[in-house]
Amino acid sequence: MTIRKAELNNLDNILKIFEHARKYMKENNNPNQWGDEYPTVEIIENDIKNSNGYICLDDENNIVGYFCFYVGIEEDYNEIYEGKWLNDKEYAIIHRIAVASNKKGVGGFCMRYCFSKYKNIKVDTGKYNIPMQKLLEKEGYSKCGIIKIKRNGGERIAFQKTE
């Protein structure tokens, strides 16, 4: 597998991956984290235009995963409840990680790629997104507390991995 920056001409394939991911979430007791429309086409386009969108390709160059990855400030991470972050250093963020239906190991590959690029990463997921929580723990992320999402008032479990 390989990782590269997503391009706008990848959009149709990326949207199919998210369609599968939303269906998978609903089938696995997590119908509300992304609902029926998140992320929107505009959100993915903005990821790509800002050079924050990445795709994972299998050995036949099929797109099998997508994620948003950048170094910056996530406003929703400014306040954390029922815990604390591992440190206050500059960090990278992973959002919107999604994997094609028939592929195993893609999520972990994407997470390891991100950590190879930046050694202090924060990420969040819904309390019912058990597969993602298990992936984060398997990849060495520590559960740090709860954050609130300003756009919808929802709560997410916050994770961090650092050297």
Description of each model-found segment:
Residues T2-K16:
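A short beta-loop-alpha structural element at the N-terminal edge
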Residues K23-I43:
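Conserved GNAT-fold acetyl-CoA-binding loop/helix
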Residues E45-I55, G72-E75:
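A short helix-loop-beta-strand connector motif used in the catalytic cores of GNAT acetyltransferases and
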Residues S51-F67:
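Conserved beta-hairpin
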Residues C68-A98, N102:
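Conserved acyl-donor/pantetheine-binding loop and adjacent beta-alpha core of acyl/acetyltransferases
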Residues V99, K103-S116, K134-K138:
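Conserved acetyl-CoA-binding loop-helix of GNAT-fold acetyltransferases
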Residues K117-N129:
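Conserved GNAT acetyl-CoA-binding A-motif
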Residues D124, S142-R156:
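Conserved catalytic-core motifs of GNAT/GCN5-like acyltransferases
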